[in-house]
Each structure stands twice: as C-alpha cells, then as structure tokens.
Design a protein with these regions (language model features):
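Catalytic phosphate/metal-binding cores of nucleic-acid and nucleotide-processing enzymes, i.e., regions
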Residues: 48-50, 74-75, 112, 152, ...
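Active-site-proximal segment of tyrosine recombinases
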Residues: 44-46, 136-137, 147, 155-166, ...
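DNA breakage-rejoining catalytic core of tyrosine-based enzymes
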Residues: 1-13, 74-82, 98-101
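Basic, Lys/Arg- and aromatic-enriched nucleic-acid-binding interface segment
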Residues: 10-42
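C-terminal catalytic core of Y-nucleophile DNA break-rejoin enzymes
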Residues: 70-89, 101-124
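Catalytic-site neighborhood detector that most strongly recognizes the C-terminal catalytic loop/helix
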Residues: 67-69, 164-189
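Conserved tyrosine-mediated DNA breakage-rejoining catalytic core shared by Y-recombinases
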Residues: 47-75, 84
C-alpha cells in the first residue's frame, strides 16, 4: 500500500475546494470540506445521511456528528464547525427531495446509495493532479491534512491522537508526516 501525504499548503487546500465549487460539483465540494473538517475516514464519511447532521424537527444542524467508526468500532463525537455547516447548506439547498434517510453523498446509481470509496478516491486524485498539488494525494490525505494542519496550529499530538482514535502516539506521528521543512521551521523560529 502506498503512503499518502497530507496537503501541507493552505492555498492548495483552498484551491482543491474551489475546484469543485467552480465546476458546480457541490457534492464533491461538500465531501472534501467535511473530510478536511471532521477527520473522518472516507468510508465513515460516505455513509453519512442527512439525519446524522441535521435535525429535521428543529430545522437546524446538529452540534455534533455521533458516529461509530467502521474500522475501530469506537463511538466518536465530532463537532460540526461553521465551514462544515456552510458546505452542507450549499448541498442541502441544491438537493431535491431531501429527507432524513437520504445519503449526503448520493451516487447517481441506485435510489439512495452513497458513492463508493473508489469513486471518491478517483474524484480527489484527479482533482489533485489537475491542480498540480504536490504529494501522493488521496481520500486519506484529507484525514491526514486535518491532523497536520491542527499540529501546525499548535494542537498537541496527544489531542490529535485522541481525535483520530489512534492506539499510540507513534501512529499519530506517522500521520502528521513531519518532514525536514517542518523541523527546519522550528529551528528558524527559536532564536533564543
């Protein structure tokens, strides 16, 4: 299995999101935005239904997504931040016949099935290639990007480990993909 990289440059993150917006691909825009802002694995993300994020009785977004992760079987609570909610709103306003059990990332094939992981992979991989984003970029890159960008903002690795539901700090450190440029930046900023 090849190693995937996080998207290190914030400009590249924005270009990836804008790529789908400009093309009017709101499902793909929302998929990327939610993946970047929730740290969910793509398999868990694609299974989301509108009732997981939206309270139809109160007509408002839920504060958190409560999900049992497919890989770890652990229950996790993820806050829906404003960026995630805004992307969901764009898609919600565009979606015809919205009902609670409707898949958020609905495939054109079948009545109410999500796109599959390989389709999501191809969507993200192709966009990264078209945009010239450096690294081996895939669906898992979006999860890694969350951790990398959180770490760059000063979030302690132990907290990122907890968010990821990792069993060890070593796994989280590998996810962060810290490279020589990151190490050099620490030395440049010390100036003691």
């Amino acid at each position: 299995m090849s190693r995937t990289d996080p998207i290190r440059d914030k400009g590249d993150i924005q270009r990836l999101k804008n790529h789908f917006l400009k093309k009017g691909e709101l499902r793909n825009y929302t998929m990327v935005t939610l993946a970047l802002n929730t740290s969910l694995r793509i398999g868990d993300l694609l299974q989301l239904k509108w009732e997981d994020v939206y309270n139809f009785r109160n007509n408002q977004y839920k504060a958190h997504i409560a999900i049992q992760e497919q890989k770890t079987h652990k229950l996790t609570m993820i806050l829906l931040n404003p960026e995630a909610k805004d992307s969901l709103t764009l898609l919600k306003n565009y979606t015809e016949g919205l009902f609670p059990e409707l898949c958020i990332f609905k495939s054109r094939i079948g009545k109410n099935r999500p796109i599959n992981r390989s389709r999501a992979f191809n969507i993200i991989k192709q966009a990264a290639i078209e945009l010239g984003i450096e690294g081996n970029i895939s669906c898992h890159s979006l999860r890694k990007t969350f951790g990398y960008q959180a770490w760059k903002k000063g979030v302690p690795p132990a907290l990122i480990m907890s968010i990821y539901n990792h069993s060890s700090l070593e796994i989280t450190k590998r996810y962060l993909s810290i490279d020589q440029d990151d190490k050099d930046e620490v030395f440049l900023n010390m100036n003691l």
